[in-house]
Structure formats: C-alpha cells, structure tokens
Amino acid sequence: MTETKLDRGVIVALRVLVGWTFLYAGTWQILQNYSAAAFLNHVVTFHGFFAHFAEPAVLPYTDFLVKWGQLLIGLSLVSGLLVRLSGPFGILLMVTYYFAHMEWPFIEDHLNLFVDFHLVYAIVIVYLIAHHAGRVWGLDGAVERLPVVAHNQFLKSLFAANAPEEYPAIPDTVVGETK
C-alpha cells in the first residue's frame, strides 16, 4: 500500500478533527458538571436498556465514564497516542449514542433514515485504527521506538504494532535516538 503526503494528511486531519470533537465534549461536560440523566431518561427506542444507566446508584459512574472517557479519547486521538487502545472505546461510545438517538427507523431529527453523525464518527475511527493513525504524525510511532516498548510485545501491541514501515511519522531523533 503506497501512501502519499495527501493520504497521510487526510489521516491526520480525520484523527485530529474527530479527536477534537471528543476532547471538547468531554472538557465542556466536566467544566459544566453535566449529567446524562435527562438524556438517558428521554431515550425512546431502547429506553429500558438506557434507563438502567440513569438509576441513582449508577448515574454517578455513568457521568464519570462519559465525561472522562470522552476527554481521554479526545486526547488520545489529537496526540496520536494509544489510538489502538482508545479507538474501540470511541467506537463503543458512538454506537451507544447512535442507538440512544433512535426513534425507529429515524435518527433523532427525522431528517435522517438510519444514519447520523455518531455512526459516521464510529466508521471514521475504524478507518483510523485500520490505518495506524497514531503512527502518522502522532506519538504512537515515537513511543513504539522507545527501547522499553520496542522489546516488550504487549506494550508494542498497544501502539501501532504490525503497522507498515511507510508510516515512520516522527523522526527517531524525537525520542532521543541518533543515527
């Protein structure tokens, strides 16, 4: 697979833009002390499932996981650090929001049939994981070359293990190595 500068630029743009969306949402919710209770209690199609997350004993955990999860997913995508680890959580969150916004067969505003931006974001994150986006002008490539990571298969798998060598992303000098 041959990558051009344009291809890498698109991967970085998608990663940073989707990451910013998560980062901003998480930051706003933390600063505003947002609670998901009203949102969860007004879900239509899967109300029984989502109502459990709004129960008084569970809601503080739901709020914490949503706020801080969005913030951490956003930081990961914007920086390109641990994209393979945070990506599936971003997909899970977007698919969960997708089903929470359904009023079968429509999505929330009745202008969309089946598809809304949550589903699009989930697919973009799948694309980013598949293309080792953390290695493309992100920190995954640099961290993967650190000796402690390079010699530990588990740690290496958290970054961009098995990524094509055409994603060198950040020069080795960034992590202190000289050639």
What does each model-identified segment do?
Residues 1-42, 49-72, 79-179:
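Extended, low-polarity transmembrane helix blocks
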